[in-house]
Amino acid sequence: MGNNIKVTFNPDKIAAWWPAVGTYYTTTYPQNQSVFQPGIYQTTSLINPKNQQELDSVLINRYKQIDWNTWQGFPVDQKLPLVSRDPPLKPHINQSAQTFEIKPGPIIVPGIRDIPRGLVPPQTPTNRDQGRKPTPPTPPLRDTHPHLTMKNQTFRLQGFVDGLRDLTTTERYHNAYGDPFTTLSPVVPTVSTILSPPSTTGDPALSPEMSPSSLLGLLAGLQVVYFLWTKILTIAQNLDWWWTSLSFPGGIPECTGQNSQFQTCKHLPTSCPPTCNGFRWMYLRRFIIYLLVLLLCLIFLLVLLDWKGLIPVCPLQPTTETTVNCRQCTLSVQDTYTPPYCCCLKPTAGNCTCWPIPSSWALGNYLWEWALARFSWLNLLVPLLQWLGGISLIAWFLLIWMIWFWGPALLSILPPFIPIFVLFFLIWVYI
């Protein structure tokens, strides 16, 4: 009989009432509308069941043979009946028996209970059996706290859902009476197994771009910038004091603010208020000082880039030369030198004279060669520069510190010895 239930009964007797597969009325005219409820079933055939208990015992025995956690013993091709609100066809009066066949339908998940899946316990007789007006069906209660019972049912739900995943199909099924024009969608009640964390109010939400570490780094950077800015202002003020002192060898006098529209109190020329006539000159000196400091920073940056070899400048007098085709001038020549290469500006017969750019101090060599070409006396400083270049970095820092600390005191002592130092230098160079 395939995957369907066939229950044969005498139309003069109430044969069976089973919510899992449907409600059957065997009278000539049913007083109550039949309601076919969903359920999981196996092929079952009963001829004229005597009472409800007989049908219950047969179906319960069938359902007990199935392990609903692993779905062992349940045929893979078993389907569920569709929900139909239509009553059975009205039987003929002279008909001795009638067979209802429920065809397969989409899977509908049964309720989560502590009984085998698909088996719904028989209901007690209601007022419908006594001829009263049927009461409307009560909608199922909504589970407002699914997380309270989720822990005990997670394992059982997992096996049940795995079985449903194997049985679910997307084909179009007929309804309980074989009507091909009605297709009912399955209703699958699910319980979420993922609990969302409790949301807190009042806490500021930090974006991924503004993490605590980046916020601390920003604050530290602002402090460093503020510290450097105060130091720059201090350096500018000290340089302004030194520049002003050049005009007053005997000492910087106080600015009384006379000859101005607004009388001001006495102050120094390096801190004139906006109402003083010396205010514009003070800021002009500060502006020139800032430009000089910026120029020093640029010179330091150029020296650093030239030392790293990031300023490719061709030397004026190359030490090594290579003559190759002009098309290959920027390529390596027998892997002797590393690119890039420099070419002459006037090629002869399609050939270029190429020489490599120094890997370090290219700009310095170019400027030095340019100065030697115009000032020949600079060759006398070559030994001194070579000697200074051989001094270690620690010796340089020590020399700078000694000049900074003892320089002002030595200015009054060294002038008598300067001619002797010049004589010793000339002897050391030419002898």
Swiss-Prot record:
Chain segments annotated as transmembrane: 215-235, 287-307, 380-400, 407-429
Residue spans, topological domain Virion surface: 2-214, 308-379, 430-431
Subcellular location, record wording: Virion membrane
Region (Disordered): 115-146
Annotated GO CC locations: membrane; viral envelope; virion membrane
Intravirion topological domain: 2-286, 236-286, 401-406
Sugar attachment sites: N351
Keywords: Acetylation, Caveolin-mediated endocytosis of virus by host, Fusion of virus membrane with host endosomal membrane, Fusion of virus membrane with host membrane, Glycoprotein, Host-virus interaction, Lipoprotein, Membrane, Myristate, Transmembrane, Transmembrane helix, Viral attachment to host cell, Viral envelope protein, Viral penetration into host cytoplasm, Virion, Virus endocytosis by host, Virus entry into host cell
Keyword Phosphoprotein found: no
A single GO BP: caveolin-mediated endocytosis of virus by host cell
Region annotation Pre-S2: where it falls in the sequence: 149-207
PTMs per UniProt: Isoform M is N-terminally acetylated by host at a ratio of 90%, and N-glycosylated by host at the pre-S2 region.
Family: Belongs to the orthohepadnavirus major surface antigen family.
HAMAP family: HBV_HBSAG
Protein name, entry field: Large envelope protein
Organism listed in the record: Woodchuck hepatitis B virus (isolate 59) (WHV)
Taxonomic classification: Viruses, Riboviria, Pararnavirae, Artverviricota, Revtraviricetes
